Amino acid sequence: MALAASFNMTNPQPAIEGGISEVEIISQQVDEETKSIAPVQLVNFAYRDLPLAAVDLSTAGSQLLSNLDEDYQREGSNWLKPCCGKRAAVWQVFLLSASLNSFLVACVILVVILLTLELLIDIKLLQFSSAFQFAGVIHWISLVILSVFFSETVLRIVVLGIWDYIENKIEVFDGAVIILSLAPMVASTVANGPRSPWDAISLIIMLRIWRVKRVIDAYVLPVKLEMEMVIQQYEKAKVIQDEQLERLTQICQEQGFEIRQLRAHLAQQDLDLAAEREAALQAPHVLSQPRSRFKVVEAGTWEEETAAESVVEELQPSQEAMVKDDMNSYISQYYNGPSSDSGVPDAAVCMVTTAAIDIHQPDISSDLFSLDMPLKLGGNGTGATSESASRSSVTRAQSDSSQTLGSSTDCSTAREEPSSEPGPSPLPLPPQQQVEEATVQDLLSSLSEDPCPSQRALDPAPLSRPSPAGSAQTSPELEHRVSLFNQKNQEGFTVFQIRPVIHFQPTVPVLEDKFRSLESKEQKLHRVPEA
């Protein structure tokens, strides 16, 4: 009951509908947030950081739109800003694509070869029949290629903006190489025509071969950029997971604190969880047992007396069990005795050894050697009840119901199931014990009509025995002995004022002879020793 009360304590955390714990809800939120993570946008994506691969124009353009708003905030004239608005992102991807850079590298190699042939023809190191006509064609082809390079540089400045172009040093160097290659060729062509040795200055264009690096990077940087984006996504997911971990850690700390409080409460109640779990498992077996204050324990045979005997022990919790406040003590106190909350002091441990008397079959003999029934109760309502009886030998197994004789006022009975095997046969008894047995057996057979004389004694109604058939008037001596017997019984019960245990009608002549034989044993059977 204390365990149930401890678990009925107010829970600081509200219950979640549907039986779903807060931990499960947090995990679901983490999964949803992880799924809803959008591709990470590139922040401060400069021109020099763009890849040179042939990527999807729409995706790349969306990545570059965030930089345009910052570019629009630059101070200066409008011509210094990138043109075409948001469409500039498409041109940026085109100018930085791997295909365009591969084409430019091929054009550089071609113009270098053409200019070298033209120079060899002009210095007459290469002679053939139509060499001058061929040199003129080479000159114009080289001029067109250099013009294409210059147009590409102007397009870069217009699309990227003058500031981004100037900030990128490698692009400034590339533009300078193009201008230095195109300007001498144009000047020599205007001054001397296509046949001029000054066209060799245009060979400086071969410095633009560095574009090969851009082609190589076009196949490496996309993979690198993709991995960086994946890393950024994992970093963002890691931040979310760290936040959820902090929340779960806080929940675990709160639950740990609550567990410590519950354990402290259980420690104050002196409860043992392991014992309570075992008691809960054994509860069905305990509940199936009969509710009785007494249990019958079959004792072994004595060396002196080789007779089977049944010992009735009162179920009292031991001192250690009473100190230990667990579920087993609760169950045993509930079914086997009064609880400590009732205010009634527990009686002392009582051991009763007696012979079982079958009230339904009075003809069956049951041997009883001697009987001492002391009972002393103090003035404060507590006392030690001690009952001692001699061991009895049972000639056969108990019947379906058997009653034990004792001084307990609750008049409890112990039952044993009939056994199919016959009990051990008793040994011959001494003559004195046989006489005592016969005397007590006659007395008990006369009392067999009332299964619980002590309870009848506590009844306020007057007790009377029906007179047996054919009985005659009894003598005054027998009535005097019976009154002495009842008076001694009343002296034994100093606390409870009870009526005589045995009340005989004046017409009982049969018991006169029985009490005469019992006179010598009256002191032993019915005397209450001072305890």
Curated annotation (Swiss-Prot):
Residues 380-477 are annotated as: Disordered. GO terms for molecular function: protein homodimerization activity. This is Transmembrane protein 266. Homodimer; disulfide-linked. InterPro entries: TMEM266, Volt_channel_dom_sf. The transmembrane segment S4 functions as a voltage-sensor and is characterized by a series of positively charged amino acids at every third position. Transplantation of the transmembrane segment S4 into HVCN1, generates a functional voltage-activated proton channel. Disulfide bonds: none annotated. Its main location: membrane. Residues 1-102, 151-169, 221-531 are cytoplasmic. Keywords: Cell membrane, Cell projection, Coiled coil, Disulfide bond, Membrane, Transmembrane, Transmembrane helix. Residues 231-251 form a coiled coil. The chain crosses the membrane at residues 103-123, 130-150, 170-190, 200-220. Residues 124-129, 191-199 are extracellular. It comes from the Eukaryota. Voltage-sensor protein present on the post-synaptic side of glutamatergic mossy fibers and granule cells in the cerebellum. Despite the presence of a voltage-sensor segment, does not form a functional ion channel and its precise role remains unclear. Undergoes both rapid and slow structural rearrangements in response to changes in voltage. Contains a zinc-binding site that can regulate the slow conformational transition. Residues 383-412 have a biased composition (Polar residues). It is a multi-pass membrane protein. It is found in: Cell membrane; Cell projection, Dendrite; Perikaryon. Residues 421-431 have a biased composition (Pro residues). The keyword Disulfide bond applies.
